């Protein structure tokens, strides 16, 4: 995993989980080979993904459709890149 999104979602983490699954079917799987989503309580979440094309991921997250979805669902997050420390 090389990307982490840490945030909150007003409509609940299961809403986000359903949307991630939908997005993977509509093309996000082209640049995200695997992902996991953890519910941290109080509508908080940690999403981890293995991104094979950071430019593609950035472009996907910044589309008008995605930004509207975030606003409509009260989804606020910070994105972090990560690297594996050792084998």
Task: Please give the residue ranges for each predicted region.
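Short S/T/G/P-rich N-terminal loop/turn motif that feeds into the first structured element of a domain
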Residues: 1-69, 75-87
């Amino acid at each position: 995993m090389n990307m982490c999104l840490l945030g909150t979602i007003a409509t609940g983490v299961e809403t986000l989980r359903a949307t991630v699954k939908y997005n993977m079917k509509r093309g996000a799987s082209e640049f995200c080979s695997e992902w996991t989503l953890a519910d941290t309580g109080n509508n908080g979440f940690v999403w981890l993904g293995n991104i094979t094309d950071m430019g593609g991921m950035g472009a996907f997250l910044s589309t008008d459709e995605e930004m509207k979805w975030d606003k409509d669902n009260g989804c606020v997050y910070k994105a972090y890149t990560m690297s594996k420390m050792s084998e």
